A protein has these predicted regions:
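N-terminal topogenic module of multi-pass integral membrane proteins
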Residues: 1-42, 47, 53-55
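Membrane-interface transmembrane-helix boundary segments in multi-pass integral membrane proteins
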Residues: 2-16, 159-170, 180-218
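Hydrophobic cores of alpha-helical transmembrane segments in multi-pass inner/ER membrane proteins
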Residues: 13-25, 78-90, 137-151, 204-220
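Membrane-interface helix-boundary motifs at transmembrane edges
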Residues: 29-42, 90-99, 150-162, 226
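Cytoplasmic-side transmembrane-helix entry/capping segments in multi-pass membrane proteins
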Residues: 40-44, 72-73, 99-106
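Hydrophobic/aromatic-rich structural module bridging two neighboring secondary-structure elements via a short loop
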Residues: 64-98
């Protein structure tokens, strides 16, 4: 089985999931007009995301010869984002603080991972549970973020910048706890880079992400003000 990035299996996965995602979002946009209908769509997606991230974490718990329940807690930015985003969609209110922290991180992280799933060859087939659940929770997270934006559930504004600061701090706190208490060699790339041979640890990625996110917020704010000016 060709498990290379952009190999046969990866291309087949993209050829199936991307069109289905687009079609699903288009249909949701067309038919989910009421707030109740939008809520049903979003909570269904949130439930699906929660299922896949829990399956992924359980596959890590039982992956080796001994049961390791400490693995139930995600130790990556994407994994934790999938978990907290799913919970926020299921139990949070519109435009909640978690959305403001996770929408951009989820959008960027899920897109990069779906297009470059470096874990694809970790098992004998793509159906190896840690692999397929990893692919699917990233794919569903991407759909969830797009659906939240599409349905106007997030009012993106620079005034909520602090959500990203506190969210990122919380992630690193969890990571430090996992390393100190459970003996993880690394968590949230505190100690090791996301790409081997690069300096891209969390401490390097954080300012890069902050600058990129700040530029996105600035662009959105300028576009919003221009539209308001044109209306007046």
């Amino acid at each position: 089985m060709d498990l290379r990035v952009f190999g046969t299996v990866h291309l087949i996965y993209l050829a199936i999931t991307l069109p289905l995602s687009v079609i699903g979002l288009v249909l949701a946009k067309k038919y989910a007009k009421s707030e109740k209908a939008k809520s049903i769509v979003l909570k269904s997606l949130g439930g699906l995301l929660l299922i896949w991230i829990l399956i992924n974490r359980l596959s890590q718990v039982y992956r080796y010869d001994q049961v390791r329940w400490e693995q139930i807690i995600p130790d990556s930015f994407c994994g934790m984002t999938s978990l907290v985003l799913a919970l926020a969609v299921l139990f949070g209110k519109k435009d909640n603080a978690v959305y403001h922290f996770t929408w951009f991180l989820g959008l960027v992280g899920a897109t990069i991972t779906v297009l470059n799933p470096t874990f694809l060859s970790q098992g004998p087939t793509v159906f190896y549970l840690p692999t397929i659940s990893g692919l699917l929770h990233h794919s569903v997270a991407l759909v969830v973020v797009v659906a939240l934006l599409m349905f106007g559930q997030i009012h993106i504004t620079y005034q909520k910048w602090y959500c990203t600061f506190f969210g990122f701090t919380a992630y690193l706190t969890v990571g430090a706890f996992q390393m100190a208490v459970f003996g993880f060699q690394d968590s949230f790339h505190i100690a090791e880079p996301i790409l081997s041979g690069t300096p891209l640890t969390a401490w390097v990625m954080a300012p890069i992400y902050a600058v990129g996110y700040g530029m996105v917020l600035l662009a959105i704010e300028l576009i919003r003000r221009k539209k308001q000016k044109n209306r007046s």
